[in-house]
């Protein structure tokens, strides 16, 4: 990764932050993009990355991001599109504004990021990783906007991979399950209040039926993102790498048989 220039959206927290720390430790030139300056500056203090504050779903902001990146580093070798997070509520509970926010936060950010970086990526035969979710593959309760947008990321991954593969640009998607991040910690709060339990106990509860019986650490997902933009993954494009501890392989109806031994 030494001297490769990697653009990371959502770089101030969670998986984006973990990617920055991992790649910065390997000598990559980092471009750290997000809405809030303070967390980006904190990450940059450790990694030496270029901090760019703005909206990853804005074409105008991206024009500035790309210009600043070219001025500092000359071009772009990889994009990690980690921004996202909106979209709670069932369809009937989702207002027009909430729907637009879900699409903008989870899908538009990825599209605008890819479109803006592609000219430079084409020059360098670079790669893109879009951060999906287990919600790209399955539907949780009352997360209509988030689930729809994350499903659409798979289509975006495949479309980009099909269109730009002949010019040497690879595009892949990582779909984590539960990952211990500040955003996921917030999602544990209702369980903690309802069951009067700790954060660790809440994570244990949501992963109780996951084959590995635990959430991922952000660093584990960062390692997969690093692999996908490396030369070691040179034949991979259009792929969906599921990193969910095995939750998506569970045949849910058969859990009833496993639980027979739990009944008195």
Go through each PLM region and give its residues:
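Conserved glycine-rich cofactor-binding loop
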Residues: 12-14
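Substrate-binding pocket helix/loop in short-chain dehydrogenase/reductase
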Residues: 90-91, 95-103, 206
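Active-site helix of classical SDR
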Residues: 114, 149, 157
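Alpha-helical segment proximal to the catalytic Tyr-Lys
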Residues: 119, 162-166, 234
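Residue(s) in the substrate-gating loop at a strand-loop-helix junction
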Residues: 133
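Short C-terminal tail/terminal secondary-structure segment
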Residues: 138, 226, 237-264
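C-terminal helical subdomain
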Residues: 173, 181, 196-232, 236, ...
């Amino acid at each position: 990764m030494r001297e490769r220039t990697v653009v990371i959206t959502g770089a101030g927290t969670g998986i984006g932050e973990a990617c920055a720390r991992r790649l910065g430790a390997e000598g990559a030139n980092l471009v750290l993009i997000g809405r809030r300056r303070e967390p980006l500056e904190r990450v940059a203090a450790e990694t030496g990355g270029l901090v760019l504050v703005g909206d990853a779903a804005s074409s105008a902001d991206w024009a500035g991001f790309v210009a600043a990146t070219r001025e500092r580093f000359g071009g772009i070798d990889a994009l990690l599109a980690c921004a996202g997070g909106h979209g709670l509520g069932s369809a009937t509970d989702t207002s027009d504004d909430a729907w637009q926010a879900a699409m903008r936060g989870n899908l538009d950010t990825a599209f605008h990021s890819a479109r803006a970086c592609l000219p430079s990526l084409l020059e360098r035969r670079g790669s893109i990783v879009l951060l999906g979710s287990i919600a790209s593959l399955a539907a949780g309760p009352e997360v209509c906007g988030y689930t729809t947008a994350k499903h659409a990321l798979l289509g975006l991954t495949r479309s980009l991979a099909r269109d730009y593969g002949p010019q040497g640009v690879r595009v892949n998607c990582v779909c984590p399950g539960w990952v211990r991040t500040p955003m996921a910690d917030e999602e544990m709060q209702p369980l903690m209040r309802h069951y009067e339990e700790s954060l660790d106990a809440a994570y244990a509860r949501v992963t109780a039926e996951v084959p590995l019986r635990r959430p991922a650490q952000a660093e584990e997902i960062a390692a997969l993102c690093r692999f996908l933009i490396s030369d070691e993954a040179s034949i991979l494009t259009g792929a969906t790498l599921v990193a969910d501890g095995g939750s998506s392989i569970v045949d849910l109806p058969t859990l009833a048989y496993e639980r027979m031994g739990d009944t008195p």
